[in-house]
Design a protein with these regions (language model features):
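Short amphipathic alpha-helical/adjacent loop interface patches that line ligand
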Residues: 8, 186, 220
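Short alpha-helical functional segments enriched in proximate histidine and acidic residues
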Residues: 133, 137, 219-226
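N-terminal lobe of the biotin/lipoate ligase/transferase fold
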Residues: 1-136
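Conserved small/polar residues in nucleotide/adenosyl-binding loops
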Residues: 230-236
Length: 236
């Protein structure tokens, strides 16, 4: 019984709603909104992004994991996503609050065919894609704060961290880390973030994380390949 209780406790901590009955057992009431490969592959309609989908309950940083995979040759479009980050980080090595099951904490591996000097446009491309995805969710007042934030009424909703590896002449790969606050409530934020952060839930957008992730990945793919096509046309 002790072993069963420990398993039930662990499942509840992951968001499973389980009812207990004295001397009768347990009943599963509701499954959590997890970003599992099975959940996402059933709904995701992309050609490249997320075809390789690396999912973890927890990790230090998705950018660190994605960088390791990229150095091993992971293909473009590989997505690394976690339910929580122990050491999430943003620009200038600032910490990024990444609690379990409350947001989208993910990194994307890109291998664009343009010169390194043009790499910063990937960050702008991502910001545009995210803003368009938010419009589809019903959030119309999200704005881009250059170079890597999306704000709503002055409060941060999204952080983007883009890291490039390559030479002066050629990009080997880009790891794009994105953090989106989805389910976090005002009272759940650390004191130092209460006045400067927001989430989709705090902006009255009620959406499952799986659906939000689907919209974001599909828009990221669309904007990225449009960007590559425009770059190719401009070079011809």
């Amino acid at each position: 019984r002790t072993a069963i209780w420990k398993h039930i406790k662990a499942l509840r901590q992951k968001g499973y709603k389980i009812e207990s009955y004295t001397k009768r057992g347990y009943r599963l009431l509701e499954e959590p909104d997890l970003l599992s490969p099975l959940a996402m592959k059933q709904i995701l309609k992309t050609d490249v992004f997320g075809k390789r989908y690396v999912y973890m309950d927890t990790t230090e940083s998705t950018n660190l994991e994605a960088r390791r995979l990229a150095q091993q040759g992971a293909e473009e479009g590989t997505v690394v996503v976690t339910e929580e980050q122990a050491a999430g980080r943003g620009r200038l090595s600032r910490g990024w609050y990444s609690p379990f099951g409350k947001g989208l904490w993910f990194s994307l591996i890109l291998r664009p065919d343009f010169p390194p000097v043009e790499a910063p446009k990937c960050t702008l491309m991502a910001a545009v894609a995210l803003t368009k995805a938010f419009h589809k969710m019903g959030l119309t007042d999200a704005g881009i704060k250059w170079p890597n934030d999306i704000l709503v009424n002055g409060r941060k909703l999204v952080g983007i961290l883009t890291e490039m590896s390559g030479s002066m002449e050629e990009i080997s790969h880009i790891v794009m880390g994105i953090g989106v606050n989805v389910k976090t409530k005002q009272e759940e934020l650390p004191e130092e973030l209460k006045l400067i952060a927001t989430s989709l839930a705090m902006e009255d957008i009620d959406i499952e994380r799986t659906e939000a992730f689907r919209l974001i990945l599909e828009e990221l793919e669309h904007q990225y390949y449009d960007c590559l096509l425009y770059t190719s046309d401009a070079a011809d």
